[in-house]
């Protein structure tokens, strides 16, 4: 008879750390948490600090904090001054030289929030990968979350990198984002950009699919319990489905003439539409960073210039964009001291 005696393998420091990080607790930490939690905490903390106390007087000539009288919709952490270029604006860098007050004044909090926010989003994506692997499911949640990451990185980092400085990035605030949207329209004609059109179709299409799917499932729930409502009839361990896919298919076949007959294809489509919309929007913003133009219908512009009675919605929008540029530039970039004489301001029956 042979007796095999096993020896306990000596566990290294990596194994001990791995065990602690993946320990079953109320809030899972994991290796991704080492990136997610510090960066997300600092990004949110930096934004709350900036919107509460820090002025934008030295960067945009604006009041932007609760301390100065702003509210939740008008407060913001504003982008750095144009003169700062694409500097990382480190607290210990040559611009601030360790002076926290000066660092806040020149816009250091914006780069702080933008960079930590980017890494926080990446950490959250990695968290979904990590937990999916531990639970034993596919990582489509993490893949879907690549869409918001792509939009954030393209808007807040890649667009200003293609422009003159961080100054042209959106500031972190509600009204500040609206100002940025007007800027994109006036200077890039963003709404006529095909990538923006695909993005709108993806986001609104995803919302439509979500509403239809939720309503259809609610409509076809099996009432297989004796409780007061159908929610209690569901148990997490039940073997049968909770709603009738066959009935749902029958319903939409009668409505449209076609319907999803496969749950996998249905849910993949619900994943694909909004994520593709986010990615196409991100690609479009990278195009704006390089100053790529949207659709130009020059023949309509030439005819409108020759014939005062000819006008289209396109030529209307071109005039409106000229107005946005002329009246916004002086307000938006006070450091340039723009002065536009009356004869260069846009004219026409569109305005």
From Swiss-Prot:
Its main location: plastid. Chlorophyll a ChlzD2 binds at residue 116. It is found in: Plastid, Chloroplast thylakoid membrane. It catalyses: 2 a plastoquinone + 4 hnu + 2 H2O = 2 a plastoquinol + O2. GO terms for biological process: photosynthetic electron transport in photosystem II. The chain crosses the membrane at residues 39-59, 123-139, 151-164, 206-226, 277-293. Keywords: Chlorophyll, Chloroplast, Chromophore, Electron transport, Iron, Magnesium, Membrane, Metal-binding, Oxidoreductase, Photosynthesis, Photosystem II, Plastid, Thylakoid, Transmembrane, Transmembrane helix, Transport. SUPFAM superfamilies: Bacterial photosystem II reaction centre, L and M subunits (SSF81483). The D1/D2 heterodimer binds P680, chlorophylls that are the primary electron donor of PSII, and subsequent electron acceptors. It shares a non-heme iron and each subunit binds pheophytin, quinone, additional chlorophylls, carotenoids and lipids. There is also a Cl(-1) ion associated with D1 and D2, which is required for oxygen evolution. The PSII complex binds additional chlorophylls, carotenoids and specific lipids. It is a multi-pass membrane protein. Its EC number is 1.10.3.9. Photosystem II (PSII) is a light-driven water:plastoquinone oxidoreductase that uses light energy to abstract electrons from H(2)O, generating O(2) and a proton gradient subsequently used for ATP formation. It consists of a core antenna complex that captures photons, and an electron transfer chain that converts photonic excitation into a charge separation. The D1/D2 (PsbA/PsbD) reaction center heterodimer binds P680, the primary electron donor of PSII as well as several subsequent electron acceptors. D2 is needed for assembly of a stable PSII complex. Belongs to the reaction center PufL/M/PsbA/D family. PSII is composed of 1 copy each of membrane proteins PsbA, PsbB, PsbC, PsbD, PsbE, PsbF, PsbH, PsbI, PsbJ, PsbK, PsbL, PsbM, PsbT, PsbX, PsbY, PsbZ, Psb30/Ycf12, at least 3 peripheral proteins of the oxygen-evolving complex and a large number of cofactors. It forms dimeric complexes. 2 of the reaction center chlorophylls (ChlD1 and ChlD2) are entirely coordinated by water. This is Photosystem II D2 protein.
């Amino acid at each position: 008879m042979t007796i095999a005696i096993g020896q306990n393998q000596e566990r290294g420091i990596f194994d001990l750390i791995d065990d602690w990080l993946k320990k079953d607790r109320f809030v899972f930490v994991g290796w991704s948490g080492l990136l997610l939690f510090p960066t997300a905490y600092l990004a949110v903390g930096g934004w709350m600090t900036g919107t509460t106390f820090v002025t934008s007087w030295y960067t945009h000539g604006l009041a932007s904090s609760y301390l100065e009288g702003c509210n939740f919709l008008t407060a913001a952490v504003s982008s750095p001054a144009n003169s700062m270029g694409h500097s990382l604006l480190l607290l210990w860098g040559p611009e601030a030289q360790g002076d926290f007050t000066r660092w806040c004044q020149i816009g250091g909090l914006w780069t702080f929030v933008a960079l930590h926010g980017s890494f926080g989003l990446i950490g959250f994506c990695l968290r979904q990968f990590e937990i999916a692997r531990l639970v034993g499911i596919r990582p489509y949640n993490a893949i879907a979350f690549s869409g918001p990451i792509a939009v954030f990185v393209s808007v807040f980092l890649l667009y200003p990198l293609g422009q003159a400085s961080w100054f042209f990035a959106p500031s972190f605030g509600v009204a500040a984002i609206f100002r940025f949207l007007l800027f994109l329209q006036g200077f890039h004609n963003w709404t006529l950009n095909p990538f923006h059109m695909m993005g709108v179709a993806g986001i609104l299409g995803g919302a439509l699919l979500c509403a239809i799917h939720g309503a259809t499932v609610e409509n076809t729930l099996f009432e297989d319990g004796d409780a007061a409502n159908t929610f209690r009839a569901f148990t997490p361990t039940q073997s049968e489905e909770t709603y009738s896919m066959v009935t749902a298919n029958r319903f939409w076949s009668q409505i449209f003439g076609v319907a999803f007959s496969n749950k996998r294809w249905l849910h993949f489509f619900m994943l694909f539409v909004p994520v593709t919309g986010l990615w196409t929007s991100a690609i479009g913003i990278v195009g704006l960073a390089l100053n790529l133009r949207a659709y130009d219908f020059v023949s309509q512009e030439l005819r409108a210039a020759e014939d005062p009675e000819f006008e289209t919605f396109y030529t209307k929008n071109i005039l409106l964009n000229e107005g946005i540029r002329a009246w916004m530039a002086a307000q938006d970039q006070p450091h340039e001291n723009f002065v536009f004489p009356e004869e260069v301001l846009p004219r026409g029956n569109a305005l």
